[in-house]
């Protein structure tokens, strides 16, 4: 069965390119096997959704502000906005902050990558060039068989 793969070719391509676009069968299972094999060779893995990512570089690697929906809005009475803005915007750690400590390689696995624009995908594909330990896998949708390609090449072809 082709899904019983060792993951060596996938790991080799991931380390060479830094960011891969992954197309997985809709019944699932293959991606978790690949992630488990990468964890076994020392990667610290973080799995999250690409929805609501915003500016990828700031959200993943930099100290940034988090705008809570109910803060920073004007209070209104009887339909008229009155008063000053309420609240302050807290600064939060980058999402990958704790994983960036140490020397082990980091794997960021983004689900639902098909919702990202070409500019967001381009920014994500450039992140491993800035942080060499960071490797990124973006699930780009379903396919009949498991396949992957360089995220940079996918962005260029769009």
Curated annotation (Swiss-Prot):
The protein's annotated catalytic reaction(s) are: a plastoquinone + NADH + (n+1) H(+)(in) = a plastoquinol + NAD(+) + n H(+)(out); a plastoquinone + NADPH + (n+1) H(+)(in) = a plastoquinol + NADP(+) + n H(+)(out)
Q: Tell me the GO molecular function terms.
A: oxidoreductase activity, acting on NAD(P)H, quinone or similar compound as acceptor; quinone binding
Give the EC number: 7.1.1.-
Keywords noted in UniProt: Membrane, NAD, NADP, Organellar chromatophore, Plastid, Plastoquinone, Quinone, Thylakoid, Translocase
Whether Translocase counts among this entry's keywords is yes
**Places the protein is found:** Plastid, Organellar chromatophore thylakoid membrane
Keyword Lipoprotein belongs to the record: no
What's the main place this protein lives? Answer: plastid
Family matches, as HAMAP family: NDH1_NDH1N
Q: Quote the function comment for this protein.
A: NDH-1 shuttles electrons from an unknown electron donor, via FMN and iron-sulfur (Fe-S) centers, to quinones in the respiratory and/or the photosynthetic chain. The immediate electron acceptor for the enzyme in this species is believed to be plastoquinone. Couples the redox reaction to proton translocation, and thus conserves the redox energy in a proton gradient.
Q: Which family does it belong to?
A: Belongs to the complex I NdhN subunit family.
User: Subunit comment for this entry?
Assistant: NDH-1 can be composed of about 15 different subunits; different subcomplexes with different compositions have been identified which probably have different functions.
Q: What name does UniProt use for this protein? A: NAD(P)H-quinone oxidoreductase subunit N, organellar chromatophore
């Amino acid at each position: 069965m082709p899904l019983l793969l060792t993951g060596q070719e996938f790991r080799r391509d991931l380390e060479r390119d830094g960011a891969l676009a992954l197309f997985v069968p809709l019944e699932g299972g293959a991606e978790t096997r690949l992630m488990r094999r990468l964890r076994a060779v020392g990667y610290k893995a973080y799995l999250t959704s690409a929805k609501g990512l915003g500016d990828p570089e700031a959200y993943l690697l930099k100290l940034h502000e988090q705008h809570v929906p109910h803060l920073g809005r004007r209070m209104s009475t009887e339909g008229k906005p009155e008063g000053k803005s309420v609240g302050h915007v807290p600064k939060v750690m980058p999402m990958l902050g704790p994983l960036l400590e140490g020397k082990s390689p980091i794997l960021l696995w983004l689900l639902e990558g098909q919702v990202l624009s070409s500019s967001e995908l381009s920014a994500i594909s450039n992140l491993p060039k800035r942080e060499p330990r960071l490797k990124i896998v973006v699930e780009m949708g379903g396919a009949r068989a498991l396949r992957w390609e360089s995220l940079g090449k996918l962005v260029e072809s769009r």
